[in-house]
């Protein structure tokens, strides 16, 4: 299963490291990543592969939400199919 993860918040040291380390702990592979800083705001979108994940999708969602709170950013995850359906032009 592939999923899209978005991260948005005020820029500070450790956001990418914090998100990527928790994904690695859950055996989630980052297939593609794009990040940008817009003035003082950090934005990142990742395409991930959960096929080897050691936890359920709901657990991944919970863990990312908790990590986001610790980092002071919003982290959202969506199934790639749902993301594509919602963002089709």
UniProtKB/Swiss-Prot annotation:
- Pfam families per the record? ACT_6
* Record InterPro entries: ACT-like_dom_sf, ACT_dom, UPF0237/GcvR_regulator, UPF0237_ACT
Q: Where is the ACT domain?
A: 4-78
What domain of life does the UniProt record list for this protein's source? Answer: Bacteria
SUPFAM superfamilies documented for this protein: ACT-like (SSF55021)
- PROSITE patterns in the record: ACT (PS51671)
Matching NCBIfam families: PRK00194.1
Q: Which HAMAP family match?
A: UPF0237 (MF_01054)
Name the family. Answer: Belongs to the UPF0237 family.
Protein name, as recorded = UPF0237 protein CA_C0478
